[in-house]
């Protein structure tokens, strides 16, 4: 394994996130990786993971599953449209677009539609439910990356814990087993 990596000379050996510095430091996401993106509220975690999902599914055509425990499919798709179009969000939301921007918007929406991205916005998803859905997506669509937005809203149904921290820890361990 180390010998194989040395032949790659710093190349991405896993799945590229589309963020050059991150890919350089991690060599891409490897099949056994569980990566947690954590930060204080309103720091851009959702925007970051949506950008990675877009880079993987739209640009690299890698099948991605995105489980959002906080936002609806519509909210996520709207954010992704703004992300891929490179048109200010206010203009898209208001519909005040120049003719060339309508064309750009149409093209980018088609790109998103054609991308191998599978979004699930089931609220209060349990670890068991997520694992079941994720395994089905892997089996039926060849999903290679699973992104969970807002892990703290997930529950470990049927189990009791002394603290929420213990529950999140158990959820994380269970997800690693995916």
Residue ranges of model-derived segments:
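Pre-Walker A segment
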Residues: 1-33
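Cytosolic-facing regulatory segments adjacent to core modules
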Residues: 24, 55-142, 156
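Short hydrophobic/aromatic beta-strand immediately N-terminal to the Walker A/P-loop
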Residues: 35-36, 65
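Conserved lysine of the Walker
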Residues: 45
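A conserved segment at the C-terminal end of the G1
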Residues: 50-54
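Substrate-engagement module of ASCE P-loop NTPases
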Residues: 55-58, 167-178
């Amino acid at each position: 394994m180390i010998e194989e990596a040395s032949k790659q000379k710093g190349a991405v050996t896993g799945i590229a996130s589309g963020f050059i510095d991150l890919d350089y430091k991690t060599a891409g996401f490897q099949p056994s990786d569980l990566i947690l993106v954590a930060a204080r509220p309103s720091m851009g975690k959702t925007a970051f993971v949506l950008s990675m999902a877009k880079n993987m599914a739209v640009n690299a055509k890698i099948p991605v599953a995105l489980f959002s425990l906080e936002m609806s499919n519509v909210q996520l798709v709207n954010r992704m449209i703004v992300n891929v179009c490179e048109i200010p969000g206010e203009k898209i939301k208001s519909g005040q677009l120049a003719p060339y921007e309508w064309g750009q918007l149409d093209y980018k929406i088609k790109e998103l539609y054609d991308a191998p991205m599978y979004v699930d916005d089931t609220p209060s998803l349990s670890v068991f439910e997520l694992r079941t859905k994720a395994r089905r997506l892997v089996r039926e669509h060849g999903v290679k990356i699973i992104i969970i937005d807002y892990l703290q809203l997930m529950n470990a149904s049927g189990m009791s814990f002394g603290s929420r921290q213990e529950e999140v820890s158990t959820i994380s361990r269970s997800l690693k087993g995916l």
